[in-house]
């Protein structure tokens, strides 16, 4: 409930810190609404400070749904912005942290070229497409990547047995071990792995509608994730309803995620519009 205060303080502290450390960055890369005020504050209060002049700001969008929207009273009570600058963060009668970053950052990036195009569409933009259309000249999508040293089944220490495309035998060992770890019986049925945040934009409603049907087709499911309580409860119920078919771990365990990527036959990405997610790349 106090996230606006927390991240306002954090954003201001980032810039104040630069006055007191022996390092001047060339670029400040700010991610999502939680640090969206950094380019706002820099443009208003810090660009003219001699020891901080010349720094460029880049704002990266991972999910445009979460924008940091609050009442306009935040401008005077919390943000400490001068009256003349309220229009920078105002959008549709609210303070919108992300909109402020769009206005003031030198560059706007996001996690894929496709997503950069999609968020110009009202269907995907969650209301911010008019602003982004006016900022197209500084909007670029860079495709997400993964660390191939970390996501490498031939060397991954989290796996019970390593394997590769040239030597794939360890894949079957990983599948058997995964089923045992998740409390499911071994068998020949295809195993579908899901590693995701359990929220609506990641496809929670979509998979809830078809889950019973998919279990009926003969799949086994191993699921790792956390998020909104309603979706966590759905998967808990499915694990109770199909104890030999569905196993769920609520939370995020990095090593288990690697074992799901390695042991599952199919990686399921239910999000209707995944923004260049790392899960499919990792699997």
Predicted features by range, described:
Residues 1-283:
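Catalytic cores of nucleotide-sugar-dependent glycosyltransferases that transfer UDP/GDP/TDP-activated
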């Amino acid at each position: 409930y106090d996230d606006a205060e927390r991240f306002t303080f954090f954003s201001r502290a980032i810039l104040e810190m630069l006055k007191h450390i022996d390092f001047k960055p060339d670029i400040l890369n700010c991610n999502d609404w939680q640090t969206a005020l950094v380019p706002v504050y820099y443009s208003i209060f810090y660009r003219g400070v001699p020891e901080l002049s010349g720094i460029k700001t880049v704002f990266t969008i991972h999910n445009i749904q979460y924008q940091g929207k609050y009442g306009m009273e935040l401008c005077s009570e919390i943000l400490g912005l001068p009256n003349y600058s309220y229009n920078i963060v105002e959008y549709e009668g609210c303070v919108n942290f992300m909109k402020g970053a769009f206005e003031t950052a030198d560059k706007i990036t996001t996690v894929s070229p496709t997503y950069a195009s999609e968020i110009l569409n009202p269907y995907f933009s969650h209301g911010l497409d008019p602003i982004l259309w006016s900022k197209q000249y500084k909007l670029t999508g860079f495709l997400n990547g993964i660390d191939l040293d970390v996501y490498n089944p031939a060397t991954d220490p989290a796996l019970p047995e390593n394997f590769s495309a040239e030597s794939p035998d360890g894949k079957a060992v990983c599948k058997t071990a995964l089923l045992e770890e998740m409390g499911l019986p071994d068998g020949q049925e295809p195993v579908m792995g899901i590693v995701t945040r359990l929220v609506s934009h990641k496809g929670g409603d979509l998979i809830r509608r078809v889950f019973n049907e998919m279990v009926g087709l003969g799949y086994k499911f191993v699921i790792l994730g956390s998020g909104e309580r309603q979706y966590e409860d759905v998967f808990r119920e499915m694990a109770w309803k199909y104890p030999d078919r569905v196993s769920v771990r609520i939370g995020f365990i990095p090593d288990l995620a690697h074992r799901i990527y390695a042991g599952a036959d199919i990686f399921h990405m239910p999000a209707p519009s995944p923004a260049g997610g790392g899960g499919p790349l990792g699997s």
